[in-house]
């Protein structure tokens, strides 16, 4: 196709030269430069006035044809056509600029290539482009189908403005309307509804829906664990298990609770946390809302109920009202707002959702009857010794404000409350030593306040329950001041009950107290711990007990136990025994203490001790004093040895703690004028050394002593108790007994209620009691199988 044919076709399509000229210029003006239609009309009028004749254009074409034919051999046909049109367009552009007015020349200074592209547009090509544009959306949709993996990521906007999910998956399940990309995924999903499990394990007959589940299960039988932890070397069947395990090393917690924003390392722990905390929280909030609605309806109906007639206490009603107001606010929110605002209700849950439990725990604490008074309470209640009582005391909210002031006034461990006791049950028994130490520092004003009665309680409260509890507290106040975590001997009860008088309950004396140690000059009771002056070592006493209990004489079943409280005919001297002093000598006593009550108490106590002493020593000729006297010891207690010197007394006071720490059988002491006799166990034939004179031992011969004991044994119809002897105990432990005590070198041993005082030989201090062999004079005293090795008084 040459240039002539192309030009002829172009002229025929355009229809006229004038029309062609104007159309080309209009394309340049409107399509490229963007001028208005007014400028386009002006350009058409100028071109129509100065149009070129048809012959000039043909002559120009011939000149171009001759010049281009020379280069046809060197240039290809396509390049030749482009070059020809470019030259032609340049010539026409120059002519147009010359003929147009000066104002339109700048608007026509545009690239000619754009005009050329629009000029040579074919109709068939335009139709092809339209068809491609119609097919393009369908093709793009098919391509998106292939690339789409998860339909959950495609978001659509519904008519109401909410977001929805677009699921382009065509395979839909008939049971649950779930859509899948392929038929394979659909059929695998249908197995869940039908229950079909086509894949079976060859070893354990377990069946699975999918094949990879079967393959993963078979690794359990083969023991294959392909996934290994890099840090600790543990191996796992699944990769997920390994990744979950690695979080324990790294401390990563990727899962977060949507309510409280707490992080967890495993999904199951997140679910458990939601179930335990937040779901139960919602249920309790609903219950509280119902209760709050009932309470508000009662108040609106006009029923006036007193605080005691109301089923709920005041604090509980306040908490419930707070919850009901919170539930009214919650009811105005929808479910989406609830999830966002869960954190706002966390303080409500942590502080006051458990109404019932909080009322039981926070409102009540156990209060032991405390003593914030002086030493007069010990004297008033010396005869009454009760077991510790647990008193439920309702705590007032105002009491916590008075706590620092009360702690400054009294140092009693039970007169104040700690903060930890407010929110829980605090079962605390009275520490006797700390209580007695603090009693010496108490004020007299507090004594007066307590003696006045329930009209002025220690904690001034208008609550009726506090008043009732104060009456109970005053009832047990004296018992608490004389109690040291053991069941002591209740003298007042024993005096009024004959059955108990016949079988006196023995006192289990605590290690932290001594027996009947009261000062006569300064009567501020200060009982100090005896751990530092425990003169008999624990190892010595334990060895003694082991020797008694395991001696190879067929008596292994005899054991010494603290729990054995059925010890008859034994006298209990408690650490709070009152000395026999006149009221003028009682310096620390209260002015309001009744002397008549004290006299009655001492009289009952004396009667009981006299009866018990008569039963234990009714045939004892060495008990010269028929009356009962109380012990008054000197005030040099911490420096006083266990045995006093000989020039003062023959047998002085022996602290019970020196025997208690290593022995299971509790020792009892009997006050007799100015000393204690040693009385233990079940035997009614103990030997109290209870002469009135300090030289009573020299007045009696050894043979008379043995005759008296032998006749005493024969006169009773009671079976003879076996006395265990321990001769091997003398040598290794003689030094602690002999060196640490200033007047006696005897050995002590308890044998089923009897006391034997033994020594390695006749000592210089007690020449009146020589030691002889048992086989000479012991025929009527004991039936021990090891009589040849034991020694006793002769």
Swiss-Prot record:
Record's keyword annotation contains Mitochondrion: no
InterPro entries linked: C2H2-ZF_domain, Znf_C2H2_sf, Znf_C2H2_type
Basic and acidic residues biased stretches: 321-336
UniProt keyword annotations, A-Z: Acetylation, DNA-binding, Dwarfism, Intellectual disability, Isopeptide bond, Metal-binding, Nucleus, Phosphoprotein, Repeat, Repressor, Transcription, Transcription regulation, Ubl conjugation, Zinc, Zinc-finger
Modified residues (Phosphothreonine): 194
Main localization category: nucleus
Region spans: Disordered: 298-336, 574-596
Record localization: Nucleus
One Gene Ontology term of the molecular function aspect: zinc ion binding
GO terms of biological process kind: cellular defense response; gamete generation; negative regulation of DNA-templated transcription; negative regulation of gene expression; negative regulation of transcription by RNA polymerase II; positive regulation of transcription by RNA polymerase II; regulation of transcription by RNA polymerase II; substantia nigra development
Post-translational modification (record): Sumoylated with SUMO2. Desumoylated by SENP3, resulting in the stimulation of transcription of its target genes.
N6-acetyllysine modifications at: 607
Residue(s) of cross-link: Glycyl lysine isopeptide (Lys-Gly) (interchain with G-Cter in SUMO1): 356
SUPFAM superfamilies named among the record's database cross-references: beta-beta-alpha zinc fingers
Source species, domain of life: Eukaryota
Per UniProt, location of the Glycyl lysine isopeptide (Lys-Gly) (interchain with G-Cter in SUMO2) cross-link in this chain: 6, 88, 115, 132, 291, 308, 356, 402, 421, 424
Residues the record lists as Phosphoserine modifications: 51, 250, 301, 306, 412, 665, 784
A Pfam family annotated for this UniProt entry: zf-C2H2
Zinc found in the keyword field: yes
Record function comment: Involved in transcriptional regulation. Represses the transcription of a number of genes including gastrin, stromelysin and enolase. Binds to the G-rich box in the enhancer region of these genes.
Quaternary context: Interacts with HNRNPDL. Interacts with the 5FMC complex; the interaction requires association with CHTOP. Interacts with CAVIN1.
Family membership noted in the UniProt record: Belongs to the krueppel C2H2-type zinc-finger protein family.
Pathology linked to this chain's protein: Global developmental delay, absent or hypoplastic corpus callosum, and dysmorphic facies: An autosomal dominant syndrome characterized by underdevelopment of the corpus callosum, mild to moderate developmental delay and intellectual disability, variable microcephaly or mild macrocephaly, short stature, feeding problems, facial dysmorphisms, and cardiac and renal malformations.
Descriptive protein name: Zinc finger protein 148
Taxonomic lineage of the native organism: Eukaryota, Metazoa, Chordata, Craniata, Vertebrata
């Amino acid at each position: 196709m040459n240039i002539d044919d192309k030009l002829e076709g172009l002229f025929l399509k355009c229809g006229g030269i004038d029309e062609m000229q104007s159309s080309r210029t209009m394309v340049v003006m409107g399509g490229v430069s963007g001028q208005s239609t007014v400028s386009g009309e002006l350009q058409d009028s100028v071109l129509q006035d100065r149009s070129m004749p048809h012959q000039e254009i043909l002559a120009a074409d011939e000149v171009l044809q001759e010049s281009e034919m020379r280069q046809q051999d060197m240039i290809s046909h396509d390049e030749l056509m482009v070059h020809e049109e470019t030259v032609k367009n340049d010539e026409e552009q120059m002519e147009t600029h010359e003929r147009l007015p000066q104002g339109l020349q700048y608007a026509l200074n545009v690239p000619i290539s754009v005009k050329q592209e629009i000029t040579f547009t074919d109709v068939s090509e335009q139709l092809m482009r339209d068809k491609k544009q119609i097919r393009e959306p369908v093709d793009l949709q098919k391509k998106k189908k292939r690339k789409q993996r998860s339909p959950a990521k495609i978001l659509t906007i519904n008519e109401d403005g909410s977001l929805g999910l677009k699921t382009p998956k065509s395979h839909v399940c008939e049971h649950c309307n779930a859509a899948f990309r392929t038929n394979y995924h659909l059929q695998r999903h249908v197995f869940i509804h039908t229950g079909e499990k086509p894949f079976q394990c060859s070893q354990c007959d377990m069946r699975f829906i999918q094949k990879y589940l079967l393959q993963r299960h078979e690794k359990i039988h083969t023991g294959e664990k392909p996934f290994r932890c890099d840090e600790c070397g543990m191996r796992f069947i699944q990769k997920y298990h390994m990744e979950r395990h690695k979080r324990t090393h790294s401390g990563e917690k990727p899962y977060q609770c949507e309510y409280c924003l707490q992080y967890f390392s495993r999904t199951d722990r997140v679910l458990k946390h939601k179930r335990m905390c937040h779901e139960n929280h919602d249920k309790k909030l609903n219950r509280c809302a119902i209760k709050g609605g009932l309470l508000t309806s009662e108040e609106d109906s006009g029923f006036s109920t007193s605080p005691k007639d109301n089923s709920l206490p005041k604090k509980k009603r306040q908490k419930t009202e707070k919850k009901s107001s919170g539930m009214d606010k919650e009811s105005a929110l929808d479910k989406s707002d609830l999830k966002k605002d869960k954190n706002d209700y966390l303080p409500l849950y942590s502080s006051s959702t458990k109404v019932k439990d909080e009322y039981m725990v926070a409102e009540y604490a156990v209060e032991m009857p405390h003593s914030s008074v002086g030493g007069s309470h010990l004297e008033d209640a010396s005869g009454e010794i009760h077991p510790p009582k647990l008193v439920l005391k309702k705590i007032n909210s105002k009491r916590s404000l008075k706590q620092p002031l009360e702690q400054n006034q009294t140092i009693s461990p039970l007169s104040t409350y700690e903060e930890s006791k407010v929110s829980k049950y605090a079962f605390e028994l009275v520490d006797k030593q700390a209580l007695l130490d603090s009693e010496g520092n108490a004020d007299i004003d507090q004594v007066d306040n307590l003696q006045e009665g329930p009209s002025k309680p220690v904690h001034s409260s208008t609550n009726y329950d506090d008043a009732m509890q104060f009456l109970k507290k005053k009832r047990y106040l004296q018992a608490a001041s004389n109690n040291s975590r053991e069941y002591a001997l209740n003298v007042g009860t024993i005096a009024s009950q004959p059955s108990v008088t016949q079988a006196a309950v023995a006192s289990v004396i605590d290690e932290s107290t001594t027996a009947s140690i009261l000062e006569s000059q300064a009567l501020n009771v200060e009982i100090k711990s005896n751990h530092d002056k425990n003169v008999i070592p624990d190892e010595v006493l334990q060895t003694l007990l082991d020797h008694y209990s395991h001696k190879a004489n067929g008596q292994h079943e005899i054991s010494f136990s603290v729990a054995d409280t059925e010890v008859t005919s034994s006298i209990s001297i408690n650490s709070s025994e009152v000395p026999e002093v006149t009221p003028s000598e009682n310096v620390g006593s209260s002015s309001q203490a009744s002397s008549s009550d004290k006299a009655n108490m001492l009289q009952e106590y004396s009667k009981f001790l006299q009866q018990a002493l008569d039963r234990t020593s009714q045939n004892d000729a060495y008990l010269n004093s028929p009356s009962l006297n109380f012990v008054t010891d000197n005030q040099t207690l911490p420096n006083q040895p266990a045995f006093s010197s000989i020039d003062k007394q023959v047998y002085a006071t022996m602290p019970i703690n020196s025997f208690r720490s290593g022995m299971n059988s509790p020792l009892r002491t009997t006050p007799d004028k100015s000393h204690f006799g040693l009385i233990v166990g079940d035997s009614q034939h103990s030997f109290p050394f209870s002469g009135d004179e300090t030289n009573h031992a020299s007045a009696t011969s050894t043979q008379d002593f043995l005759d008296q004991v032998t006749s005493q044994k024969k006169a009773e119809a009671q079976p003879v108790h076996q006395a265990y002897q321990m001769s091997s105990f003398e040598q290794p432990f003689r030094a602690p007994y002999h060196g640490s005590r200033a007047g006696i070198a005897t050995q002590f041993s308890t044998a089923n209620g009897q006391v034997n005082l033994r020594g390695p030989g006749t000592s210089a201090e007690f020449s009146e009691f020589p030691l002889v062999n048992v086989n000479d004079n012991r025929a009527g005293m004991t039936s021990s199988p090891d009589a040849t090795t034991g020694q006793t008084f002769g």
